[in-house]
Amino acid sequence: MSSTQFDGDIDSFVSYLKSNRGLSANTLKAYRADLTACLHLFELRGVTDLNEITLDDLRSWMAVESRDHARSSMARKTVAVRGFFAWAYEHGLTATDPAATLMTPSIPSTLPAVLTESQAEQLLDVAEHAVATNQYKDDGGAAAASGSGKAAGKTADKSADTVNRSEAPARADKRDNARVTAESQRNAAILELLYATGIRVAELVSMDIADIDFSNRTIKVTGKGNKQRVVPFGLPAQRALETWLEQGRPVLARTATDAVKSRAANALFLGARGGRIDQRIARDIVHRAAREAGVPDISPHALRHSAATHILDGGADLREVQEMLGHSSLKTTQRYTHVSIEQLKNRYGQAFPRA
């Protein structure tokens, strides 16, 4: 990321947002990048003072950025820039607010892609089948020398060095088998939880073990703006989570270094090296599962869309789904009613004789 002479102002603005707006770390990072890119462009044009920037300059910046970015990205960039100049004006850094009338690009209301209920079932069935196929009982290393007493009696004349060399590959295979099983259990739990709750992938990877309440079958979710909500989940998700926590998680936790283990001690989901799983791995898990299940390629966010649509199809109230998804606006949740209507029209066309 290019640095600018305005970095100090950007830092102050981001600190202000962090303290007063409760925005997520990802949003703050995006705003910082947007502002740095914007002000760097003006710097290249010879601007040395924020007071030199006009509304026409900002419109010119938008025209340049629009060539390479989607409207949704431009909407976020515009919000960041408008917020920055409003803050600068309020704090006496500028004599006017050139961005006060800067218009946010309109975003077309597109229907989110979703799986059908049967496709979602197929996706989860494949993940469950992978757990059964890769099932390997891990004993924490206690059985590494199983049968070694008899072997020692028969081969007493062999050197200890020879025995150790012959046992090493078996121990390595055992560790690999246990890891594959653990990852299958983790993947199944991730897919079940994403579909059962409709949570965002960022919310999933930030979850701790303590956020799960098995007695009430609910999870505590920390969403955008650090807002918390409680979301229920069903029996299939409970079973998958219990299997992961009791059998799979301990296996992956043992692969971590002490430093990683300390940082990920409370994490619900772990990566192959025992650290807290990141969003990229979670997305890969969903994409790979979709390929293996033979359903349309989807992202974790599309799985969230699917969950919301299926819950509404089942008769849930729109306000309840809004609360479950953590939407601040009911308008955002209403998109899923449009999807449900489209699916209803499709089913109507297939089933009704006078369609």
Curated annotation (Swiss-Prot):
One of its GO terms (molecular function) is tyrosine-based site-specific recombinase activity. Its main location: cytoplasm. The active site is at residues 200, 224, 301, 304, 327, 336. Residues 141-154 have a biased composition (Low complexity). Pfam families: Phage_int_SAM_1, Phage_integrase. Keywords: Cell cycle, Cell division, Chromosome partition, Cytoplasm, DNA integration, DNA recombination, DNA-binding. The keyword S-adenosyl-L-methionine does not apply. It comes from the Bacteria. PROSITE patterns: CB, TYR_RECOMBINASE. Residues 138-180 are annotated as: Disordered. One of its GO terms (biological process) is cell division. Residues 168-178 have a biased composition (Basic and acidic residues). CDD domains: INT_XerDC_C. Residues 4-89 form the Core-binding (CB) domain. InterPro entries: CB (IPR044068), DNA_brk_join_enz (IPR011010), Integrase-like_cat_sf (IPR013762), Integrase_catalytic (IPR002104), Integrase_recombinase_N (IPR010998), Integrase_SAM-like_N (IPR004107), Tyrosine_recombinase_XerC/XerD (IPR023009), Tyrosine_recombinase_XerCD (IPR050090). Belongs to the 'phage' integrase family. XerC subfamily. Site-specific tyrosine recombinase, which acts by catalyzing the cutting and rejoining of the recombining DNA molecules. The XerC-XerD complex is essential to convert dimers of the bacterial chromosome into monomers to permit their segregation at cell division. It also contributes to the segregational stability of plasmids. This is Tyrosine recombinase XerC.
